[in-house]
Amino acid sequence: MDLLLLEKTLLGLFIAAITAIAISKLRGRRFKLPPGPIPVPIFGNWLQVGDDLNHRNLTDLAKRFGDIFLLRMGQRNLVVVSSPELAKEVLHTQGVEFGSRTRNVVFDIFTGKGQDMVFTVYGEHWRKMRRIMTVPFFTNKVVQQYRFGWESEAASVVDDVRRNPDAAAGGIVLRRRLQLMMYNNMYRIMFDRRFESEEDPLFVKLKALNGERSRLAQSFEYNYGDFIPILRPFLKGYLKICKEVKERRLKLFKDYFVDERMKLESTKSTSNEGLKCAIDHILDAQKKGEINEDNVLYIVENINVAAIETTLWSIEWGIAELVNHPEIQKKVRDEIDRVLGPGHQVTEPDMQKLPYLQAVIKETLRLRMAIPLLVPHMNLHDAKLGGYDIPAESKILVNAWWLANNPANWKRPEEFRPERFLEEESHVEANGNDFRYLPFGVGRRSCPGIILALPILGITLGRLVQNFELLPPPGQSKLDTAEKGGQFSLHILKHSTIVAKPRSF
């Protein structure tokens, strides 16, 4: 850092300190704020709680300060909600007031400051984007149209694993093949495209760029520059990398997928009724002037992250729990054999006849929630919550993982026990009918991808279990299920090697 930058930084810190003290005194008189650790000027609670605001750390703070508490992270207010009643207020009762999204400096880059659907503020743009995305992605008609493709992709996974001699011996990192499956599931819907193998050069490039985007966005290491704007110059290099990755991804989406589809469609006559895949609907909306080219690319961006990676995380967690609980794995296999008969491969319509498999999926989503804090909410204006004043533009985090793992609300929540969803919690569904269990959120800003994720999870886990005995690698009794949290993600830290011993029918 040169001397001039240092002088400017120190001067800025001094001015920020005076401003923070003045604002704090004014707000203290005006607002009845939620409880929380006592902040210090400039830094707020950042030096006390650190960067890693994962679900478990926030749970520990909730045990100290209550079901609603406030963290002042530099200039940002974070309100954390940890009870079903308050979650209902945020997501349902006051869904409009808290219906916007807050973005940080990195998500501003990757979403074009909210030109997408997931991270835009609540308003006309969000309603338009949600409407445009619903028809080609999030309806029962889409499920019925594409479930054959999902079943075909799952069958290809089974065939490839059977042919791999390492699978039944030392084991393989099954996630790698499942990642290809998930890309094919979603790229069939988006572009009527698929990748032939893990070595496909375009798939390799796409996977690498998406992985780098996720790493950069989910990291906690840039929080200091987001919380304390005067420190943002120190993020210059980090943000430069983010911008480069963003531009490369959007260019790849445009050159290899969107433009290719437009060329294909220009060679034939297509009516609205004949549209084959999602991008056709989206490009039609662009032609009508409802959205622009950037919006089209950010829709593709959302699907690459929100649909592919999150479902893959849940599949990986489900496999790990089944490997570590062989008695549960056997119950799933026995149910499939008994209900469908040996050799009849699980299909999407079969899921309704397989309650124990459904319970395993629910339990995976409860204990290993892919988005444990949901996607953060924000109130555009001053609001009330739980008897407290919530300043405008506060970041609202709903600790959905703790709602689903609080022993005050669940029987032995630390156990992986699918039976709970057939016994004492048999009424609970993943669609948000119970505010203790919100793996996809609920209300206006809930995840519409639930309609795709649940059948894909069922088909994938069902076919793996009915075709293989899934085991830890030689020398291990269990898989390592250590967690890796992100800004609001939860996935397994180590991609485990799995032994898959084929069954004979």
Curated annotation (Swiss-Prot):
Cofactor: heme
GO cellular component, one term: membrane
One GO biological process term: lignin metabolic process
Induction section of the entry: By fungal elicitor.
Residues annotated for (E)-cinnamate binding in this entry: R213, S214, R215, L216, A217, Q218, A306
Example of a GO MF term: iron ion binding
Keywords, alphabetical: Heme, Iron, Membrane, Metal-binding, Monooxygenase, Oxidoreductase, Transmembrane, Transmembrane helix
Family: Belongs to the cytochrome P450 family.
Function: Catalyzes the first oxidative step of the phenylpropanoid pathway in higher plants by transforming trans-cinnamate into p-coumarate. The compounds formed by this pathway are essential components for lignification, pollination, and defense against ultraviolet light, predators and pathogens.
Protein name: Trans-cinnamate 4-monooxygenase
Organism listed in the record: Glycyrrhiza echinata (Licorice)
